[in-house]
Each structure stands twice: as structure tokens, then as C-alpha cells.
């Protein structure tokens, strides 16, 4: 049970990280020169940590 819950939270964390990076839907952060840097960073943090929301927001948003 806890394994399924963890997987769901992991997926949401990845999607949130990609969204913050403007990966799924372009946002204000995609207009800057963070494009190529933001993609790799959002992917790496989202997949590597599973908690890429905080990291992606810090790098991509500002």
C-alpha cells in the first residue's frame, strides 16, 4: 500500500518539477535563457531526487 502511495507521490513530484520548468506547458520561466539549462535541471532533479519541485522552482523560476 505504501509503495503505491510513494509511486503516486513520485509521479506528482516529477510532473510538478517539469511544469515549474515550463516543460509541460510553457510558463514565464521558459522565456528566459534558462531553456536548455532548465530542461536538464528539471529532468535531473525530478528523476534523481523525486523531490525536484523545490530545486526546479529555485533554478527555473528565478
From Swiss-Prot:
Keywords: Signal. Residues 1-22 form the signal peptide. This is Fungus-induced protein 1. It comes from Caenorhabditis briggsae. The keyword Signal applies.
